Amino acid sequence: MSLPAPDRRMGGWTGVGYDDIEMGRTYPAQPLPISAEDVARFYRSLGEARPPPAIGTRIPAFLLNEIRALKKQMKFPPGVLHAREEIEMRSAARLGEPLTVSITIANKYIRNDRRFIVFDQHVRCATDQRSIMTIKHILYWPC
């Protein structure tokens, strides 16, 4: 089976190519800081005027689902697209709890002449290692 040609329409880059991505690679857990201002900004973006959140307030799950942790570990090529995700919420995260996020490259595959990378993200409470959320991201990887 021949591999599709890399899609380099977005111009030159010096990032991580599809062939360089190692399935099964796990990156060290990183802090996932969420501040009261982050929570307040989230609600303002929805048009809600709320009082400043207090320590112990539940963090909206949307704020925990991010790919900055992976972008800190590898440089994305131009043209990466978020194709799909699956989220499993296991426990509430509370403002003031130290959170961590770990990343594992779960799979990579070619479908319809397009390259895809699957990575699993796991958010935990650093204090008691409680599982907060797992997210399976599927990204289109152009080259």
What are the language-model segments listed below?
Residues 1-84:
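Hot-dog-fold acyl-thioester-processing enzymes
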Residues 1-16, 93-143:
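HotDog/MaoC-like acyl-thioester-processing domains
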Residues 22-23, 88, 140:
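Low-complexity, compositionally biased segments
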Residues 29, 35, 40-42, 89-90, ...:
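Residues in flexible loops and secondary-structure boundaries
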Residues 65-69, 90, 117:
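Short amphipathic alpha-helical patches
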Residues 84-90, 104-105:
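Short structured motifs
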